């Protein structure tokens, strides 16, 4: 028996064990255990179905090879073997995909955070441009985008944008966008035609619930203040703006987009939880990195992952040495799959 067949046999054995356990009186009476085992069985159900089919094909191949010695049935066996070998190959491809460890966050909604970095006003303008590209991509995927918070600069760009993106598989598609995005282009205000380089950071934070991230209220410092408008002018006569700081990590979130202090506090707390969860993910990825052949990226905001060179119409994805000369088309159409699909394929290949 091949190594793959042995692995699949052990998965089937475990699936059958779980079926027996889930019908036992001891487990049925224990809600926690029942939920835990049901979740485990559900996670291997798809691979179990494929495993049964694959092992059945292997058995049929073995039987037909034996029939090759039979003069009357050899021709029929040869034809059958051709079909079976194709089935075997197709199943092996599908099974390899199913054996790739699932990211537990892949089905989650996300908080997308874009911040202007080096480059002044031009960085802020690119925050808006990249956010529009993400919105177009979300539209193509039938996702819903809700701006949670935004801070504009004086030239129509943004210091920061935070948005909640909801839909099927949002995190699985956008998780590799985290990091530093560098843009090279001639600003509209540049009379000499010189190319400016600026950078923005992107953070991708899974939306989490209270069970996944528990915060001790005593670890929070909550401050309220009056919301300020553009240029710092006061736009609210009540203390509706909120700043929440998580003291153990010094992670801070400010929110003033809503007129209600309660709503601002609720939004700030949700983003704070997402940032704390993101921090947990980063720490886990760093701990697991040595067990992987290579990482697509740590998700660290300081890691320069991509360059957008407008004069050359070039998009360079540094983590996988991918270069595309269709930058403007990608940004205008929002078809980020040209970059995202190769990143996902590369990440999956590290588990093969």
Curated annotation (Swiss-Prot):
Renumbered to this chain, the Basic and acidic residues biased-composition regions fall at 289-306
Query: What are its GO cellular component terms?
Result: cytoplasm
Q: Which residues carry this modification: N5-methylglutamine?
A: 233
| Compartments in which it is found | Cytoplasm
Molecular function per GO: translation release factor activity, codon specific
Family the UniProt entry places it in: Belongs to the prokaryotic/mitochondrial release factor family.
Q: Which SMART domains match?
A: PCRF (SM00937)
Instruction: List the cysteine pairs that form cystine.
Output: none
Tell me which InterPro entries the record gives.
PCRF, Pep_chain_release_fac_I, Pep_chain_release_fac_I_sf, Prokaryotic/Mito_RF, RF-1
Disordered: region residues: 288-309
Task: State its role.
Answer: Peptide chain release factor 1 directs the termination of translation in response to the peptide chain termination codons UAG and UAA.
Keywords, A to Z, come to:
Cytoplasm, Methylation, Protein biosynthesis
Concerning HAMAP family, the annotation shows: Rel_fac_1
Identification of the protein by name: Peptide chain release factor 1
- PTM (free text): Methylated by PrmC. Methylation increases the termination efficiency of RF1.
Q: Which Pfam families match?
A: PCRF (PF03462), RF-1 (PF00472)
């Amino acid at each position: 028996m091949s190594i793959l067949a042995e692995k699949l046999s052990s998965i089937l054995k475990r699936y059958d064990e779980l079926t027996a356990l889930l019908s036992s009186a001891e487990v049925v009476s224990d809600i926690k255990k029942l939920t835990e085992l049901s979740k485990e069985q559900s996670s291997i159900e798809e691979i179990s179905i494929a495993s049964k089919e694959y092992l059945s094909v292997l058995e049929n191949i073995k039987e037909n090879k034996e029939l090759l010695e039979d003069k009357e049935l050899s021709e029929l066996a040869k034809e059958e073997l051709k079909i079976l070998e194709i089935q075997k190959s197709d199943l092996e491809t599908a099974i390899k995909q199913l054996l790739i460890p699932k990211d537990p966050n892949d089905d989650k909604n996300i908080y997308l955070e874009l911040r202007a970095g080096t480059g002044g006003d031009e960085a802020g303008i690119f925050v808006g441009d990249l956010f529009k590209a993400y919105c177009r991509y979300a539209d193509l995927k039938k996702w819903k985008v809700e701006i949670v918070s935004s801070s504009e600069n004086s030239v129509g760009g943004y210091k920061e944008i935070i948005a909640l993106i909801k839909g099927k598989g949002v995190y699985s598609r956008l998780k590799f966008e985290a990091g530093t995005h560098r843009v090279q282009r001639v600003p509209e205000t540049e009379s000499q035609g010189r190319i400016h380089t600026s950078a923005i950071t992107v953070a991708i934070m899974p939306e989490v619930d209270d069970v996944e991230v528990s915060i001790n209220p005593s670890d929070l410092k909550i401050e309220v203040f009056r919301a300020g408008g553009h240029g710092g002018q006061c736009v609210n006569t009540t203390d509706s703006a909120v700043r929440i700081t998580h003291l153990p990590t010094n992670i801070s979130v400010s929110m003033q987009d809503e007129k209600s202090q309660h709503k601002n506090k609720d939004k700030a707390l949700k983003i704070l939880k997402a940032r704390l969860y993101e921090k947990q993910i980063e720490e886990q990825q760093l701990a697991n990195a040595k067990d992987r052949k290579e990482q697509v990226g740590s998700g660290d905001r300081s890691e320069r992952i991509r360059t957008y060179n407008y004069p050359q119409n070039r998009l360079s994805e540094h983590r996988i040495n991918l270069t595309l000369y269709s930058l403007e088309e990608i940004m205008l159409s929002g078809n980020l799959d040209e970059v995202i699909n190769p990143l996902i394929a590369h990440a999956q290949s590290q588990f093969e």
